[in-house]
Amino acid sequence: VTTRALDQLASDAELAAPHELAGLIDRCGRALGAETTTAYVTDLQQHVLQPLLPPGAHLANEQLAALDVDATLAGRAYQTLLPQQQDEEGGTRAWLPLVSGTQRLGVLGVRLPNPPDEEALGSLTRLAAAAATLLVAKTPYGDTIVRLRRRDHLGVASELHYSILPPLSYASGAVTVSAALEPCYEVAGDVIDYSVDAGRTQVALFYGMGHGLHSAQCAVFTVAAYRSARRSGLSLLDILVSVDDALVTGL
């Protein structure tokens, strides 16, 4: 049953838009015996978990409101990466971490008629893994999930800044890269970029002096020049010279 339900989720999601994921994830959860299944996505500052709801859905109860990361079982599941359970009237609610690689996205909230046994928990864990993969894959194709992660307005400079950033966390058996930008709604100028390839990991930090649109433009231009040089196979010194030349002639 689990494999069939997950295969159906993968098939249905192939041509799905970001706003359709909520319904698909819930449908898969029902096929696995859940009453409701809701993905919660963390905001940029990782303070709250916001529910991903189908278009037009209303907050039917407090469980579908934003959840505090530091004060709820859902938040504990997010922080510890371990499933959590709580008894509720007429059933049980399980919280499972949504993780893609090492990127923590949020949690999966699952309402069940009875406490899950080991097999059921294993099935829900597989659903959480599939949901996390879909969230990462579908986010760039719409604003639904992007808006969900924002609790404040991003100005032009910050929007430009975020558009050039790679994923802020990555890990393999050989290397781990992690970064955070603050104040996250007013970033403009500080940029990280990295590349993990066979036998080599390259990490670069850039600081566009000042703070504002001009600083963000400078940082974005610098990253583009850096990637162009790096992907052309230049040495570290030649990359530096190439980026410097691009800045002198291009800005």
Which residues are covered by each model-predicted region?
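Signal-transmission linkers at sensory-effector interfaces
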Residues: 1-15, 137
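Structured interaction and signal-relay segments at domain junctions
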Residues: 13, 21-82
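Flexible loop/coil segments at beta-strand boundaries within sensory signal-transduction domains
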Residues: 45, 98-104, 196-197
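A short, aliphatic-rich beta-strand micro-motif
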Residues: 84-100, 106-108
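Short beta-strand-to-loop transition segments that serve as allosteric relay/switch motifs
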Residues: 106-116, 208-209
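Amphipathic alpha-helical "output/dimerization" segments
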Residues: 116-136, 221-224
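Amphipathic coiled-coil signal-coupling helices
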Residues: 134, 138-145
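… and, occasionally, acidic/histidine-rich disordered N-termini of signaling adaptors
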Residues: 145-251
